[in-house]
């Protein structure tokens, strides 16, 4: 809106620069989240929209009155900033907004059910998976219709591994959406544990998206060019800004939790960025913390079902370290460090190809 008005009608040249609009979107989303979150916290406390705490984590029982669904606020702030600063005629922007709103809605349904039932169960697994699957499939098909190429790239290699048939590509993209959204959801168990690794991952992906959308940079770095995808940089920076605003209230001890409303939206948008920038495989490194958390759950369940033994004291793995006596802050900061280092290595693949 603001972009179309100031550049399209008044020809204010500053708004033609993607980096300026992305920076502006960052600060709009950041300050809007800072402004709205206290009001949301007061409303959520009045409505008793609190996060049910598992009885298996006694050290977290002091958090039982902490409101949840804070993800609604930072997703809303991101959408507002994107509407103001991004080009709404760009299909990647529109699909990015659909991803954020759609995945956040599924998360909201799950959060609402948990609050109403005062249980961690939420929606049935079939219902939740079904909604996420349909949403992922719709977005993946739309990407295919848009003409996104189906080459599969590996980190540090300039040439693609192979070209996937359309049906295989769509199925693979659906898998990426489902994996990333659930992985971030599993990670969101300690104050700030999901938000900061999400910031690192989104920042890395936004750089890849910017390069992919810039003809000169993509040619120089031997990176696959994706026409029009650079505009997604604006939404990514806006989401990072809103996450910083959220972290202001989510740092330990948290005043609010993001809930599934936020974690599913983050995972879905991270997956979307990875897909359109051809970083599906590299996402394993960028989202290393999310991968580790998910694998710990898979291994724990698999071990118990096959051997009746647990590999970890508790899963996801951040609870394992808590059970071993690590302070919550120690677990959080160490996981942040791993995430930061993983993303620095991932960024090296831009130049080392």
Curated annotation (Swiss-Prot):
Gene Ontology BP terms: cell division; cell wall organization; peptidoglycan biosynthetic process; regulation of cell shape
Cofactor: Mg(2+)
Keyword Zinc on entry: no
Superkingdom of origin organism: Bacteria
InterPro entries: Glycosyl_transferase_4 (IPR000715), PNAcMuramoyl-5peptid_Trfase (IPR003524), PNAcMuramoyl-5peptid_Trfase_CS (IPR018480)
Pathways involved: Cell wall biogenesis; peptidoglycan biosynthesis
Coiled coil region boundaries: none
Gene Ontology CC annotations of this record: plasma membrane
PROSITE patterns, sorted: MRAY_1, MRAY_2
A GO molecular-function annotation: UDP-N-acetylmuramoyl-L-alanyl-D-glutamyl-meso-2,6-diaminopimelyl-D-alanyl-D-alanine:undecaprenyl-phosphate transferase activity
Keywords, sorted A to Z: Cell cycle, Cell division, Cell inner membrane, Cell membrane, Cell shape, Cell wall biogenesis/degradation, Magnesium, Membrane, Metal-binding, Peptidoglycan synthesis, Transferase, Transmembrane, Transmembrane helix
Entry membrane topology: Multi-pass membrane protein
Localization of this protein: Cell inner membrane
TM region(s), chain numbering: 24-44, 66-86, 88-108, 129-149, 160-180, 192-212, 229-249, 256-276, 281-301, 330-350
Keyword Transmembrane appears in the UniProt entry: yes
E.C. no: 2.7.8.13
The reaction(s) this protein catalyses: UDP-N-acetyl-alpha-D-muramoyl-L-alanyl-gamma-D-glutamyl-meso-2,6-diaminopimeloyl-D-alanyl-D-alanine + di-trans,octa-cis-undecaprenyl phosphate = di-trans,octa-cis-undecaprenyl diphospho-N-acetyl-alpha-D-muramoyl-L-alanyl-D-glutamyl-meso-2,6-diaminopimeloyl-D-alanyl-D-alanine + UMP
Protein purpose: Catalyzes the initial step of the lipid cycle reactions in the biosynthesis of the cell wall peptidoglycan: transfers peptidoglycan precursor phospho-MurNAc-pentapeptide from UDP-MurNAc-pentapeptide onto the lipid carrier undecaprenyl phosphate, yielding undecaprenyl-pyrophosphoryl-MurNAc-pentapeptide, known as lipid I.
HAMAP family listed in its UniProt record: MraY
Cross-referenced NCBIfam families: mraY (TIGR00445)
Family indicated by similarity: Belongs to the glycosyltransferase 4 family. MraY subfamily.
Protein name as catalogued: Phospho-N-acetylmuramoyl-pentapeptide-transferase
Species name: Helicobacter acinonychis (strain Sheeba)
């Amino acid at each position: 809106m603001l972009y179309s008005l100031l550049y399209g009608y008044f020809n204010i040249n500053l708004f033609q620069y993607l980096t300026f609009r992305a920076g502006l979107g960052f600060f709009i989303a950041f300050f809007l989240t800072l402004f709205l979150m206290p009001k949301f916290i007061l409303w959520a406390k009045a409505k008793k929209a609190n996060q049910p705490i598992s009885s298996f984590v006694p050290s977290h029982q002091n958090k039982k009155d902490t409101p949840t669904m804070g993800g609604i606020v930072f997703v809303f702030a991101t959408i507002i900033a994107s509407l103001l600063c991004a080009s709404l005629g760009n299909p990647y922007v529109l699909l990015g907004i659909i991803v954020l709103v759609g995945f956040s809605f599924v998360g909201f349904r799950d959060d609402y059910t948990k609050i109403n039932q005062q249980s961690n169960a939420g929606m049935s697994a079939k219902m939740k998976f079904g909604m996420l699957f349909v949403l992922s499939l719709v977005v993946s098909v739309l990407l295919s219709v848009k003409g996104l190429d189906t080459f599969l790239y590996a980190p540090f290699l300039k040439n693609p591994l192979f070209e996937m048939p359309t049906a295989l590509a769509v199925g693979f993209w659906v898998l990426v959406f489902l994996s990333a959204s659930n992985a971030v959801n599993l990670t969101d168990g300690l104050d700030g544990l999901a938000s900061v690794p999400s910031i690192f991952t989104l920042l890395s992906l936004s750089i890849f998206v910017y390069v992919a959308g810039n003809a000169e940079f993509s040619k120089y770095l031997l990176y696959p060019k994706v026409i029009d995808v650079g505009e997604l940089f604006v939404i990514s920076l806006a989401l990072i800004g809103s996450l910083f605003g959220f972290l202001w209230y989510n740092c330990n001890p948290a005043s609010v939790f993001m809930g599934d409303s936020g974690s599913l939206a983050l995972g879905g948008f991270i997956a979307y960025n990875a897909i359109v920038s051809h970083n599906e495989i590299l996402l394993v490194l960028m989202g290393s913390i999310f991968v580790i958390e998910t694998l710990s759950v898979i291994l724990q369940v698999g071990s118990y079902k096959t051997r009746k033994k647990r590999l970890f004291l508790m899963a996801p793995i951040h609870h394992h370290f808590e059970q071993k006596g690590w302070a919550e802050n120690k677990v959080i900061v160490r996981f942040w460090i791993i995430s930061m280092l993983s993303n620095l290595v991932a960024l090296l693949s831009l130049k080392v190809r």
